[in-house]
């Protein structure tokens, strides 16, 4: 059976990783001179505390080549095919590290690397689809072919509570960040062609903003594939998350409504209170 591996930015829960037998290759997070592995020895809340204390965003970096080789080696030596997923190439060199690891192991013919052109559970949606195909005994080439067809149909967007973290990370300018704070503006960010672009702006308290964001998606949600939808957040009030879940359930579109918490890398750039709705369009 083909082994499915993703970098840590897919933001899948431990439960889903176990269910679909997915392995994770962590990106690295630098808090000053201390280096951590995303999802292993650092939490988003620790990152927020450090970022607020230091008034800067942590640096993040691609997985270490040695770690990628160590993760791939037992499967390669057993002759198994591997399909790997990386965050958008425009955001990290994670995919390049995976390809280099495959070359170093002399297994480039059996290890396929997919640039998700996405982030968070926008990647996770594709990873789960690949894992289901693997369980159905599809080959690596077949999985890659099907996933490449699905990639343009992934819909990933999120609404942020504060522009501070995007500003610290160079994703928006100081004027926009200041105006956002004063006017209580919350932009909707959409992932398109592997990059993040701002679209609609909402005003008000984040709890009502989140619901308006979700309700604005209703027309598009009705064109979604029914298998699953992700609610991924970086530390929202649980009451808000439950209201979103109830709304999606009432639409009666999806077989599964899956809640996940954004990992360290994604959280370090978007900040607390961010909520995303992610699905695959028909």
Which positions does each model-derived feature cover?
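Mixed-charge interfacial surface used for oligomerization/domain docking
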Residues: 3, 9-23, 28, 34, ...
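Class I S-adenosyl-L-methionine
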Residues: 35-106
């Amino acid at each position: 059976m083909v082994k499915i591996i993703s970098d840590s930015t897919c933001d899948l829960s431990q439960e889903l990783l176990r269910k679909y037998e997915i392995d994770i290759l962590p990106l690295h997070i630098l808090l000053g001179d201390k280096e951590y592995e995303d999802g292993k020895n650092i939490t988003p809340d620790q990152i927020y505390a450090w970022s607020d204390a230091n008034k800067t965003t942590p640096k993040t970096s691609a997985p270490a080549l040695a770690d990628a080789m160590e993760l791939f080696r037992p499967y390669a030596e057993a002759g198994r095919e591997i399909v790997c997923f990386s965050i958008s190439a425009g955001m990290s060199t994670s995919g390049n590290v995976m390809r280099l690891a495959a070359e170093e192991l002399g297994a480039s013919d059996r290890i396929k690397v997919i640039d998700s052109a996405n982030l968070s559970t926008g990647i996770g949606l594709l990873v789960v689809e690949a894992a289901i195909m693997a369980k159905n005994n599809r080959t690596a080439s077949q999985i890659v072919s099907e996933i490449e067809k699905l990639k343009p149909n992934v819909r990933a967007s999120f609404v942020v509570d504060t522009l501070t973290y995007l500003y610290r990370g160079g994703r928006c300018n100081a004027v926009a960040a200041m105006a956002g704070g004063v006017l209580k503006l919350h932009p909707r960010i959409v992932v398109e062609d592997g990059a993040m672009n701002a679209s609609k702006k909402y005003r008000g308290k984040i709890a009502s903003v989140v619901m308006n964001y979700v309700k604005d998606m209703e027309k598009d949600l009705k064109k979604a594939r029914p298998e699953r939808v992700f609610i991924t957040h970086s530390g929202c009030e649980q009451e808000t998350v439950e209201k979103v879940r109830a709304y999606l359930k009432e639409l009666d579109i999806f077989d599964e409504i899956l809640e996940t918490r954004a990992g360290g890398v994604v959280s370090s750039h978007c900040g607390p209170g961010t909520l995303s709705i992610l699905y695959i369009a028909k």
